[in-house]
A protein has these predicted regions:
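A short, gly/pro- and small-residue-rich
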Residues: 34-52
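PTP/DSP superfamily signal
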Residues: 79-84, 105-177
């Protein structure tokens, strides 16, 4: 099936249960405390301590790095896609949508980057994928700048108006983009 549930931190328990998620990627501030939903397997929970910033060198903040992208991609490649994968950050707007794009490309590498970005925008008007995660992912996945260009094409999402989780398919629909 290959569905990715993208959520803000306050909604993870509710959405994990509602969608039957058993695995989760958490992109949260370093040392941020939160409880893993009981339905999520401890062995299939990736926690990355990374701030939502687009460049390094901002004091004590941790910028997304190649090691974070490598961990996301390795985790994605271990996802059996039998149940939806829950991906979250604090607000569900920047880090987690960027990770969802990278996960989709890790499990379905032959898909079109532009069509993928359009699917993301159709799923969420608020999503504004973290530029640094996208840029590093583009390079590591050898996309040749196509993912970066596709995300630039969809532009910044709508202003944040509250928690707006969404479900995003890792693969294009048959006969669609």
């Amino acid at each position: 099936m290959g569905r990715i549930v993208v959520a803000p931190l306050p909604k993870i328990a509710e959405l994990a249960v509602r969608h039957g998620c058993r695995e989760m990627v958490s992109l949260v501030a370093p040392r941020q405390d939160f409880h893993r939903p009981a339905v999520i397997s401890a062995g299939r929970h990736l926690i990355l301590g990374v701030n939502d910033i687009a460049f390094a060198g901002t004091g004590k903040l941790v910028a997304p790095g190649e090691e974070h992208v490598a961990a996301i991609l390795a985790f994605a490649r271990g996802w059996d896609r039998q149940a939806p994968l829950l991906v979250h950050c604090q607000m569900g707007v920047s880090r987690s949508p960027a990770a969802a794009l990278l996960i989709a490309l890790a499990v379905e590498p032959d898909q079109d980057d532009h069509a993928l970005a359009l699917r993301l925008r159709q799923a969420s008007v608020q999503a504004t994928p973290n530029a640094r995660l996208v840029e590093i992912g583009d390079r590591v996945l050898d996309r040749g700048g196509r993912l970066v260009a596709a995300v630039r094409t969809i532009g910044r999402g709508a202003d944040y108006v509250g928690d707006s989780p969404f479900v995003f398919s890792a693969a294009p629909e048959r006969g669609g983009p």
